[in-house]
């Protein structure tokens, strides 16, 4: 049981900004960390649903609610997945040799294609949320998507 609790803490410490108690970070204790990824998605989904529900309940401006909904996963995860998307976009859009693309992946600077991809990514999410946030079932499905997408580690 202690090992599972440790894996839970490691998963949240690595893939979220949610503060966790100190975990024992060794290879043997991290074997089942991936099993707890869906719980991180569950937290993101629950917060997203709560924001959508509160936005409707208290009559917030739809544009504001949609913008906050887009930011919830970024705030919970620290943007780790967005960073990976943007690095990949820069590398694949460079049309360079394989070695140079790998260098671009490791580069901490954002290139033009990363900025374009970020704008498109956030605009698409904003558009989806602005259309669906008032429909509780659609919002629930989108919220559950954060959990389901983390159920398959590969």
Which ranges hold each PLM region?
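Hydrophobic alpha-helical transmembrane segments
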Residues: 1-78, 92-100, 107, 113-154
């Amino acid at each position: 049981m202690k090992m599972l609790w440790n894996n839970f803490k490691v998963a949240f410490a690595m893939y979220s900004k949610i503060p966790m108690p100190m975990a024992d970070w060794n290879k043997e204790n991290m074997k089942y960390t991936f099993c707890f990824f869906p719980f991180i998605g569950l937290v993101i989904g629950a917060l997203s649903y709560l924001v959508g529900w509160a936005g409707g309940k208290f009559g917030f401006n739809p544009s504001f609610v949609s913008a906050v909904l887009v930011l919830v996963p970024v705030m919970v995860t620290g943007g780790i997945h967005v960073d990976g998307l943007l690095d990949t976009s820069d590398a694949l859009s460079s049309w360079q040799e394989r070695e140079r693309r790998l260098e671009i992946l490791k580069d901490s600077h954002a290139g033009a294609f990363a900025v374009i991809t970020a704008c498109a990514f956030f605009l698409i999410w904003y558009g989806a949320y602005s259309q669906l946030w008032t429909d509780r079932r659609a919002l629930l499905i989108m919220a559950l998507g954060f959990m389901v997408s983390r159920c398959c580690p590969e």
